Design a protein with these regions (language model features):
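Alpha-helical transmembrane segments of multi-pass membrane proteins
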Residues: 1-293, 305-307, 318-320, 343-353, ...
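Short alpha-helix immediately C-terminal to the canonical SAM-binding loop
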Residues: 388
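Short acidic active-site motifs
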Residues: 411
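Short, conserved active-site loop motifs that form the nucleotide-linked donor/cofactor pocket
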Residues: 400-402
Length: 598
């Protein structure tokens, strides 16, 4: 071990090391969720994977750091590991998205079930475990370097843990509310990599302490001569040993100085390169027609357009969340099917109709209803104000349509107004929020409907089986609240529109209102909906005790929407890649390259 550096004489620096290490761990964890979300969603399942892999890395780092500190208690090695962690974190914005795409490609062809889970887990292990393993070595190492008296060891360890915890708290809030919304995920990684790098550089630029040989105490020269000679002989021998050790230490310091200079130089070079090459916030780097790509507090956001349409996506790999037809015609998507709800509520018989949309998105449904119906008053609720901004800018959402920045359920709790139609179209990435899928929520919706009012729910993940998956669970839950339920599948998509009301005659009301519809395009669409509408009869339990009870009703206490959604996503992915799997089985890599025209 080389000599002690002056900076270590002050425990404040060691406490700050613990502080910034704790802060960086949490910042990387939150950055991980934002890096993975555009590809795998930000569901509770993905969060569980992120937290689990990070805890594994930290535990292994704690074990290794403690053993390494006992075996060779050299602070140079600890701060060298911090430099290595900083380098790795700085490279995440540069290569992370390519690693995710590569892992996803491999998993698609090698995993038949739970694709998102396995792909997200593999991506976390490859990208995040190593730097967090290194940061996990910090705490046990610092305990070794800061505890110099067992009498106050508890106080010292307590201070270290306090600084780590405070750093973790700050590392939780700063990325979420400051850096990610302001500068994006990529630069957030670079900021915290830079902090770790600067912390280590300060250490390595600190000089070593000087240890002088001192002088003889007064009176030592008055000792008796014989004893003095003996002492002098021993002194000469010890002096020789000291000189030998000093020479050895000087050589070690020289060797370490060269190694440390190389570490610092490598860290600075990689960090500078990463700052120039990793600043891009583009997750869909292969897309060429994007008019906007960015991040909000809640979502990854991507807007692209072609000659006919404008699209919004909150996920790189799966689906489109909103579509706007530039020519003003119907989209052919679920919005058109959902326009049956105003007819069911008697839009042609009323002077005006009040509509609430929970999950406004870019406002396609609101825009269409305003365009095709007279006297309709639409209000929207959208939790992500950046999506509302994009809706006004790119999707021509009228300024006359109010949009409230609120959680859908919280909004219903806060208002007393009632509506003729309530559209429920709220999603967190590709899964419905659990708090908007329970019997308690749908009961709340019913309480905000006028007599004869209609709720329409957009279900975006219709599976192959009619009696399992998220759409089945939602249908069972809704039918436990509303006595009249109808459903219709959206042609060519995995969407299903589900209509519910206390009015048993909504089909008759719809038919009567369609008689006065003059728009041929809309009338043709409503005829298609009418022909494909099916009454939904809930499945009930059979047997003792629970006979007659509706099965599978989701509650606030138990609403496994993520797991149910994952089952359907597996089916959708299997359908999408089956064609390419067949090509791979028959023609291998060459066949795939030819299929993609490489």
């Amino acid at each position: 071990m080389s000599g002690k550096r002056k900076i270590l004489s002050n425990k404040i620096y060691l406490y700050l090391t613990e502080f910034f290490a704790g802060m960086s761990v949490m910042a990387v964890e939150l950055g991980a969720s934002r890096l993975l979300a555009p590809y795998f969603s930000s569901s509770q399942i993905v969060w569980t994977i992120i937290i689990g892999t990070i805890m594994i890395a930290m535990a292994l780092g704690n074990i290794y750091g403690g053993r390494a500190a006992d075996k060779r208690p050299d602070p140079d090695r600890l701060y060298g590991r911090i430099i290595l962690a900083a380098i790795w974190i700085a490279l995440i914005p540069v290569i992370g998205k390519y690693v995710i795409i590569g892992i996803s490609a491999v998993m698609i062809f090698s995993v038949n079930h739970m694709f998102l889970i396995w792909a997200a887990f593999a991506a976390c292990m490859v990208i995040f475990v190593f730097p967090l393993f290194l940061l996990g070595t910090v705490t046990p190492s610092l305990v070794k370097f800061t505890v110099d008296d067992l009498g106050d060891s508890g106080k010292t360890v307590g201070m270290l843990n306090a600084f780590n915890t405070i750093g973790s708290i700050i590392g939780t809030f700063v990325p979420t509310f400051l850096t990610i919304p302001a500068v994006g995920t990529s630069i957030t990684f670079l900021i915290f990599a830079g902090i770790l790098l600067l912390l280590a550089i300060l250490y390595f630029f600190s000089p070593y302490e000087d240890h002088g040989s001192g002088s003889a105490r007064p009176g030592d020269g008055n000792k008796e001569q014989g004893r003095g000679r003996t002492s002098q002989g021993v002194s000469d021998e010890n002096s020789g040993n000291v000189n030998e050790k000093t020479g050895s230490n000087d050589k070690e310091k020289g060797s370490n100085k060269g190694k440390n200079a190389a570490k610092i130089t490598a860290g600075i070079i990689v960090f500078i390169v990463a700052c120039f090459t990793g600043r891009s916030d583009s997750f869909a780097f292969w897309e060429k027609d994007l008019v906007f790509e960015g991040e909000s507090v809640y979502n990854y956001l991507q807007v692209r357009e072609d000659d006919k349409r404008t699209y919004l996506s909150t996920n790189v790999l799966f689906g489109v969340q909103s579509v706007y037809e530039k020519d003003g015609k119907l989209t052919g998507m679920y919005y058109d099917y959902a326009m049956a709800a105003p007819y069911m509520a008697g839009v042609k018989e009323k002077d005006g109709l009040d509509m609430l949309i929970l999950g406004m998105g870019t406002g396609t449904y609101a825009t269409q209803c305003n365009r095709f119906f007279d006297g309709i008053r639409v209000e929207g609720v959208e939790i992500d104000e950046d999506i509302t901004r994009l809706a006004r800018e790119y999707f021509h959402l009228s300024d006359e349509i109010p949009v409230y920045t609120y959680d859908g359920r919280a909004y219903l709790n806060a208002v007393k107004e009632t509506y003729d139609v309530i559209m429920v179209d709220a999603y967190q990435d590709i899964t419905i929020p659990f708090q908007m899928s329970s019997v308690e929520f749908f009961t709340m919706v019913k309480e905000h409907l006028n007599p004869g009012g209609v709720m329409v729910v957009n279900m975006n993940m219709r599976g192959q089986s009619e009696k399992q998956g998220i759409t089945y669970a939602l249908a069972q839950t809704i039918s436990s609240v509303f006595p009249t339920c109808y459903q219709v599948n959206v042609r060519g998509t995995s969407n299903r529109e589900f209509f519910a009301s206390e009015n048993a005659e909504i089909l008759e009301t719809m038919a009567k209102n369609l008689e006065s519809e003059e728009n041929g395009e809309l009338l043709a669409m409503m005829q298609r909906v009418t022909e494909n509408l099916e009454a939904y009869t809930p499945v009930r339990s059979v047997g003792n005790g629970e006979a007659g009870k509706i099965d599978g009703v989701m509650t606030d206490d138990q609403a496994p929407v993520e797991l149910l959604g994952m089952q359907v996503i597996d089916e959708l992915i299997a359908d999408e890649v089956s064609y390419y799997k067949k090509i791979y089985q028959e023609g291998g890599i060459k066949g795939l390259l030819e299929a993609f025209e490489f």
